[in-house]
Amino acid sequence: MPLKHYLLLLVGCQAWALGLAYYGCPSECTCSRASQVECTGARIVAMPTPLPWNAMSLQVVNTHITELPENLFLNISALIALKMEKNELSTIMPGAFRNLGSLRYLSLANNKLRMLPIRVFQDVNNLESLLLSNNQLVQIQPAQFSQFSNLRELQLHGNNLESIPEEAFDHLVGLTKLNLGRNSFTHLSPRLFQHLGNLQVLRLHENRLSDIPMGTFDALGNLQELALQENQIGTLSPGLFHNNRNLQRLYLSNNHISQLPPGIFMQLPQLNKLTLFGNSLRELSPGVFGPMPNLRELWLYNNHITSLADNTFSHLNQLQVLILSHNQLTYISPGAFNGLTNLRELSLHTNALQDLDSNVFRSLANLQNISLQSNRLRQLPGSIFANVNGLTTIQLQNNNLENLPLGIFDHLVNLCELRLYDNPWRCDSDILPLHNWLLLNRARLGTDTLPVCSSPANVRGQSLVIININFPGPSVQGPETPEVPSYPDTPSYPDTTSVSSTTEITSAVDDYTDLTTIEATDDRNTWGMTEAQSGLAIAAIVIGIIALACSLAACICCCCCKKRSQAVLMQMKAPNEC
């Protein structure tokens, strides 16, 4: 073979080897044509090599890598995103990220990092997102993030940080999202956030904060979300949020707040969600929640509130969800809900209410769902739902109700779900109107549990819906008459027991004739019935068909309303708190 052929073969082999070095994919990884490399698996204990020189995205997940040595990524300078999560990583050497000047996204979350070298990020000045969450970090150096003028997102939640130097964020002027939740902070410096004028999301949840100094959030004029839930905050300074006029979501739940200072929420015109559940609030002063014209959700459950005064929520005319369950409410003033003209859902369950004023819900013209279960309600005014024509769900189970007023639900044409079980219903003559209404509207009771009679003793435990309620009329002595088949009373909402009994007795006496006369005239139809009996049978059949049609219509209404209700609730209800 000529010498030039040997030379060509040698050059070709070298080029092939060089191509592998630049374009090859490590056996432990998968590489796509879109310059994406993914390396996963417990068998990986060191960074796989060689990595393709044109890689733009590298993911190293669920490996046993413990260390990133110096100059590890020198040959992949085009890298834009590096994700190293859920590894055993505990050490990063200075210079590990050298030559990654194009990197925009770096995630080191869910590792075992305890300390970070002071200049570990000096070669990635163009980072926009840095995720260090769910490690074991105990300290942040004052100049740790000093070179990140382009950083937009910093995630430090889920570490063991007890404090942060007050100058740690001074150079992060472009930061829009900062998560410091689930650490062990006990205090914050008033100047910690003073250079973060572009910050939109600040999360400090699940720490040990007991007090927040006045002025801590004054520089955060663009803040939209502030998460302070699950701390140990006992008091709030009156002007704590006065400079946060763009705030939309404020989470204060599960703290130790016992009172709300007057004017605490006065300067929050954009707020649409406020959570205060799981605190120690005992009273709500009228006007404390206003004006907040954009507030849609107010969560106040699991407090110690005992009463609601007139106009407590009068400045919240766009409120759609009000949750007051699991308190100690014994009294609600008739004007407590004034101004809540757009309220859709009202939760008052698990309180100590015994009575409600007939006008208490009169201003809630758009209410759709109301939960009153697990109180001590003994009775309800007949007009309590008079102005709430759009109700689709009413929960009254687990109270002390023995009866309900005539016609209390008649105008609620959209009612789909009514819960009445676990009440001590008294099934005497007074219950017949409710019994008849339930017969015609059984589909609205659902299929889980039906209301059951508690008294008298002879009907205890029987369903209020299907029980056969018979009340004897006055006895009339007369000659023995032929036995006439009995038919169920016609289900009708008005109580007509006395009328029907008298009519039946009078008819039986007036129409009495000798049996021989009946047999002689043979005035019976094909089924062996008299004309009167045939009329009763036909009437019973017609009424049965009408009742079946009403039940079917109620079922269709219920299905349609449930879909509408779920759609509304899906639009109102927000994700879980961060």
Curated annotation (Swiss-Prot):
Extracellular side: 22-535
Cytoplasmic side: 557-578
Record keyword Mitochondrion present: no
Annotated LRR repeat ranges: 54-75, 78-99, 102-123, 126-147, 150-171, 174-195, 198-219, 222-243, 246-267, 270-291, 294-315, 318-339, 342-363, 366-387, 390-411
SMART domains (UniProt xref): LRR_SD22, LRR_TYP, LRRCT
Cross-referenced InterPro entries: Cys-rich_flank_reg_C, Leu-rich_rpt, Leu-rich_rpt_4, Leu-rich_rpt_typical-subtyp, LRR_dom_sf
Annotated transmembrane regions: 536-556
Subcellular location: Cell membrane
UniProt-annotated stretches for the region Disordered: 476-500
Inducing stimuli: By amyloid-beta.
Glycosylation-annotated residues: 75, 369
Position of the signal peptide: 1-21
GO-annotated cellular components: apical plasma membrane; cell surface; plasma membrane
Keyword Nucleus: no
LRRCT domain boundaries: 423-473
Pfam families, sorted: LRR_1, LRR_4, LRR_8
Name of this chain's protein: Leucine-rich repeat-containing protein 15
Species, as recorded: Rattus norvegicus
